[in-house]
A protein has these predicted regions:
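A compositional/structural signature for long, glycine/proline-rich flexible linkers
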Residues: 2-6, 10-196
């Protein structure tokens, strides 16, 4: 597996650049609006630009914090215990599941993801840079049989290996949020075996 280590300073620099670009784009819309458009049209366009760009900036900040503090890009992290009150990685964490998290970069090619067969409830959601769910693996969509999946970015054009299902991300960066049902702390070992 290829991993990419990003230093916290590089993350901060990328986030500053993203915020600067978003601000510059909004300023450009406002200046152009003052010259060519009515005030109402200018406000509407600025609002649309903000609504469009804000999720990308927030997602990148979330990614930068994760890779600076928990794990590098392309590394799956398993949370071994229930979250306590200090847990801030997800807005409202579940208190009956253990999490598996990763930020995946498909710039250098696709990734293989294997979901083991299990009767236990588990869901693996894949989100794009706008935080839209583009794939959700679990009992509702794949049943309990598990499977092998090829996660590819928007421009990948290779052959999907036999026995694998293609999951196409609309963006080069994807966020994996996995949850496995846990029946109390005494059940941790069984969940850890599934996460492995």
């Amino acid at each position: 597996m290829t991993t990419l280590d990003i230093a916290p300073a590089a993350c901060a620099q990328q986030c500053r650049l993203g915020r600067w670009l978003l601000g510059a784009g909004l300023l450009l819309v406002l200046v152009a609006g003052a010259l060519l458009l009515s005030q109402r049209e200018t406000i509407r366009l600025a609002a649309q630009g903000y609504v469009f760009g804000y999720p990308l900036v927030i997602t990148d900040l979330t990614r930068a914090n994760f890779v600076a503090g928990m794990a590098p890009t392309n590394r799956l992290v398993h949370v071994p215990a229930f979250p306590d009150a200090r847990f801030r990685d997800i807005v409202r964490p579940n208190v009956d599941t253990l999490y598996s998290l990763a930020w995946l970069d498909m710039n250098d090619g696709p990734w293989v993801f294997e979901l083991p067969a299990s009767e236990r409830y588990a869901v693996m959601q894949f989100l794009d840079a706008w935080t839209n769910v583009f794939a959700s693996l679990g009992p509702r969509t794949t049943g309990t049989r598990g499977g092998r999946f090829l996660l590819a970015g928007p421009h990948w054009q290779g052959q999907v290996p036999e026995g694998m299902t293609l999951l196409r991300s609309p963006t080069r960066i994807a966020w994996l949020l996995g949850r496995v049902q846990t029946n109390g702390k005494a059940d941790y070992m069984a969940v850890h075996a599934i996460q492995a």
